[in-house]
């Protein structure tokens, strides 16, 4: 049976749009901070609660790994927010497809995002000693998308005459 289009569901749609909005906001904060070091984002509540400090850290690009593995000029050494935008768009598109491969990719991509979230949360708390509201919210969104990806999609029942 081939792949067909369907609604991604309201919960997946809401989570993907929220994740996309937060990723775009993180890009905005990082760009504003690059232009003005004194920029204070809405998510900068105090010295230990500062998303702009986290986004501007070395772990805010390529998960802090790409530069050391592939070099600073690698095309993959992008802001983590770029990867977030791509991930949430992919999740939304895959959520609209009904098919075996779409389901497999949905599960695999959500598992990778949760693994990345655990890694970045560890960096956030134990290396940067910070609390990033935007980051924590995206981690929760990633867990929600992972849980959704494991739910069985109801099949359309054909009417018997």
Swiss-Prot record:
A matching Pfam family: VKOR
Reactions mediated catalytically: phylloquinone + [protein]-disulfide + H2O = 2,3-epoxyphylloquinone + [protein]-dithiol; phylloquinol + [protein]-disulfide = phylloquinone + [protein]-dithiol
BP term (GO), one: bone development
Domain topic, free-text comment: Partially oxidized VKORC1 forms a cysteine adduct with substrates, vitamin K 2,3-epoxide, inducing a closed conformation, juxtaposing all cysteines (S-S or SH) for unimpeded electron transfer. VKOR becomes fully oxidized with an open conformation that releases reaction products, vitamin K quinone, or hydroquinone. Cys-132 and Cys-135 constitute the catalytic redox-active center. Cys-43 and Cys-51 are the cysteine pair that mediates transfer of reducing equivalents during catalysis.
Localization of this protein: Endoplasmic reticulum membrane
S-S bonds: 43-51, 132-135
EC top class named in words: oxidoreductase
Annotated protein name in UniProt: Vitamin K epoxide reductase complex subunit 1
Its biological purpose: Involved in vitamin K metabolism. Catalytic subunit of the vitamin K epoxide reductase (VKOR) complex which reduces inactive vitamin K 2,3-epoxide to active vitamin K. Vitamin K is required for the gamma-carboxylation of various proteins, including clotting factors, and is required for normal blood coagulation, but also for normal bone development.
Binding positions for (S)-warfarin per the UniProt entry: 80, 139
Family of this protein: Belongs to the VKOR family.
Cytoplasmic face of the membrane: 1-9, 96-100, 154-161
Regulation: Inhibited by warfarin (coumadin). Warfarin locks VKORC1 in both redox states into the closed conformation.
GO molecular function: quinone binding; vitamin-K-epoxide reductase (warfarin-insensitive) activity; vitamin-K-epoxide reductase (warfarin-sensitive) activity
UniProt entry keywords in alphabetical sequence: Disulfide bond, Endoplasmic reticulum, Membrane, Oxidoreductase, Quinone, Redox-active center, Transmembrane, Transmembrane helix
Enzyme Commission numbers on file: 1.17.4.4
Residue spans crossing the bilayer: 10-29, 81-95, 101-128, 132-153
InterPro entries, A to Z: VKOR, VKOR_sf, VKORC1/VKORC1L1
CDD domains registered for this protein in UniProt: VKOR_euk
Amino-acid positions noted as binding phylloquinone in the UniProt annotation, renumbered to this chain: 135, 139
Primary location: endoplasmic reticulum
Keyword Nucleotide-binding found: no
Lineage of the species this protein comes from: Eukaryota, Metazoa, Chordata, Craniata, Vertebrata
GO cellular component terms, semicolon-separated: endoplasmic reticulum; endoplasmic reticulum lumen; endoplasmic reticulum membrane
Phenotype upon changing residue 128 to S: Identified in warfarin-resistant animals
Organism: Mus musculus
């Amino acid at each position: 049976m081939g792949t067909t289009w369907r609604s991604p569901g309201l919960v997946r749609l809401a989570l993907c749009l929220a994740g996309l909005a937060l990723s775009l906001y993180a890009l905005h904060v990082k760009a504003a901070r690059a232009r003005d070091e004194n920029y204070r984002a809405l998510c900068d509540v105090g010295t230990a609660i500062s998303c702009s400090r986290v986004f501007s850290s070395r772990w805010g690009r390529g998960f802090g790994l790409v530069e050391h593995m592939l070099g600073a000029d690698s095309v993959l050494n992008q802001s983590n927010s770029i990867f977030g935008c791509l991930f949430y768009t992919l999740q939304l598109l895959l959520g609209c497809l009904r098919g075996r491969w779409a389901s497999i990719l949905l599960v695999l991509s959500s598992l990778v995002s949760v693994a990345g979230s655990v890694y970045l949360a560890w960096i956030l708390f134990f290396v940067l000693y910070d609390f990033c509201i935007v980051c924590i919210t995206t981690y929760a969104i990633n867990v929600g998308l992972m849980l959704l990806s494991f739910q069985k999609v109801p099949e359309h029942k054909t009417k018997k005459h």
